[in-house]
Design a protein with these regions (language model features):
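Sec-dependent signal peptide cleavage junction
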Residues: 18-58
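Intrinsic-disorder/low-complexity, polar/charged segments
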Residues: 28-30, 195, 221-225
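Aromatic-patch recognition
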Residues: 58-60, 69-197
Length: 245
């Protein structure tokens, strides 16, 4: 009478736990449950290193915003995990937990949370994110940063989402608030970019050319800080390469 409940407990503890072992008690499992276990074991065998982490539980219904960088849709990209590059991986970047979520299988069978310190970088579409470890000489908070440009200087953006409870017509609801911070890294030194003055100081070697370029592109710091920082640092790196040729 209590056997189905017992089977569910066994499955849950083996499948959505820390995912460190195979489930192999086939005597207790049959039908669709056995298919799920077989699928999980096969996938763990094929992708043992990457697909290794706790189960990712979905968030409550959120009225405003999304906890993920690119919304709820799964993105297909690549991730460098323990110095091995994995391509065509289904992923989401959770900005609330600052964690990369990967999906086993195309049909959404099992979302897992990867151990962040083992990830060097991940990317999808034209977006790239790098992991800054605690041991880094940079005075930056440990975690993932979007790489806006890369070269002699590197522009980074740190996006943090917070899940907040709100009361709407006597009902409890949730919303996302977002905070972005920008940095430029030069020679293992990080500089916080809050104002256009900070940006111009970071690119002072080519200041006038960059100012002219931003004017031509009609880019204004106050209206689109991220685009201006990306454009300015990309041009700076291009001019640096040209001067060294």
């Amino acid at each position: 009478m209590h056997q189905p409940f017992f089977i569910c407990i066994i499955l849950l503890s083996s499948v959505i736990g820390n995912c460190q072992f195979y489930y192999d008690d086939s005597a207790l499992v049959s039908g669709s449950s056995k298919y799920l276990v077989n699928f999980y074991n096969k996938t763990r065998h094929d992708f043992n290193v990457l697909y290794n982490g706790p189960f990712h539980y979905s968030y409550p219904l959120i009225k405003q915003g999304s906890p993920y960088f690119s919304g709820e849709a799964w993105q297909k990209g690549s991730v460098t995990y323990e110095d091995i590059v994995y391509d065509t991986v289904l992923m989401k970047y959770d900005l609330v937990k600052d964690q990369l979520i990967v999906m086993i299988g195309e049909k959404g069978h099992m979302p897992l949370e990867l151990f962040s310190p083992r990830i060097k970088e991940f990317s999808y579409k034209d977006l790239k994110f790098i992991y800054i470890p605690r041991s880094s000489p940079l005075s930056l908070k440990e975690g993932f940063y979007q790489q806006l440009s890369n070269g002699k200087i590197t522009a980074l953006c740190k996006t943090e989402n917070t899940l907040e409870e709100i009361i709407v017509e006597d009902r409890l609801e949730w919303k996302i608030t977002q905070k972005k911070r920008y940095f430029i890294v030069d020679n293992n030194h990080s500089r916080t970019i809050n104002r256009q003055k900070d940006l111009m100081e970071a690119v002072k070697d080519h200041r006038q050319q960059i100012i002219n370029h931003l004017k031509e592109q009609k880019l204004k710091f106050k209206k689109n800080k991220e685009q201006v920082i990306a454009a300015a640092t990309a041009l700076y790196n291009k001019l640096e390469r040209q001067s060294n040729e």
